[in-house]
Amino acid sequence: LTPTPILVGQGENVTVDLTQMVDDPDDQAKNSFDYRVAKVPGGIDVSLDGYTLTVSGKKDQPKGPVGAITVSVDDGSGAITADIPVTIVKSSKPLVTTTDARIKVNAGQTATVNLSEYTTNPFPDPLVVLDASVHVGQGTAAGDGNVLTVTPKAGFHGDMIVVYRVMDATNDPDRVVQGRVIVKVLDRPDAPQNVTATATGPGSAFVSFQEPAANGGTISGYTIIDSVSGEPYNTINPGMEVTGLKNGVEHSFTVIAHNEAGDSDPSAPSAPVHVDAVPDQMAAPTVQG
C-alpha cells in the first residue's frame, strides 16, 4: 500500500480510488479487498464506500497540512496499513463579487446596509465584514456580521464614500474582497437671507428673500412667519404677498426653508414695515348757505 498525498480545497470534496495505491503480487482483483479507515485528522471529514475514499475539507480550515488518514487494506492474507497525508489548499470556488451600494442619509443619522444585497457569495454562510472606513466625506462606518452601519457627521452634506472588506466562510485572507457604499448625505437647508417686506395695501405686504443653499437636498417650500400674529404663511416661491395682517402696526417677517432633511433655522427678521388701511373715499363736500 503506497499512499498518494491528497489535496482538498476549503469547503470542497475529493474522491480517491484506494485501489490505485495498492500493489498486489498475487495480482488479485484489488476492488474485492477489504478497505478500512483507522484514523482521521482534524480539519477534514472522511467517508469510505468500498474502495472509494471521499475527503471533505472544512470551510474554515486554514490552508496547509492537516495530518494523515490512516487506512488499512486486507487481501485475505492479513491487513496492512499506511498513512495518507492530506493538505488543505485554497478553495477553487469563485471569490465574492461586490457592486456599489448607493444610499441617501440625513446628516447625523445612521443607516444600515445589508451587504447580502450587494454581494455574491459562493458559500451559504453569511459574509463577515472585517473592517470599514470613510474614504471621502465625514462620518463613521462599522460592520457587524454582514451588515454595515453608516453615520454621516452632523452638519456635513455632499458625497461620502465608505470602503469595506469582507471575508467568506473560508477565513482565507487571500479571499478577502473590497466593496464600496456611496452615500448622498443630506442636511437641513441654510436659513434664507435678505428678507424684505413692502406694504402693498390694507392688511397686506409682499415678502421676498434670497433662496438658501439646499445642502444636498431639494427645497420643498418656505414658511413665512408674521411677528405680530405668529401666523405662518406657506409658499414654494422665494416671495409672496401676505394678507390678513393687522392694520395700524409694524410687521416684520422671518422665513424658514424646508427640505427632506428637515427645517432650516429661522432667517433674520426683515426690517419692520407699517401696514395700514387706506381710508374710505370722502363724500363730495357740500356748501350750506
What are these regions (language model features)?
Residues 15-16, 22-51, 113, 119-147, ...:
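Surface-exposed or secretory-pathway low-complexity segments enriched in glycine-proline
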Residues 10, 63, 107, 154-158, ...:
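Surface-exposed loops/turns
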Residues 1-28, 68-123, 167-200, 208-211, ...:
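Extracellular interdomain linkers/hinges and stalk-like, low-complexity segments
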Residues 52-64, 147-157, 244:
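Extracellular/luminal low-complexity segments enriched in Ser/Thr/Pro
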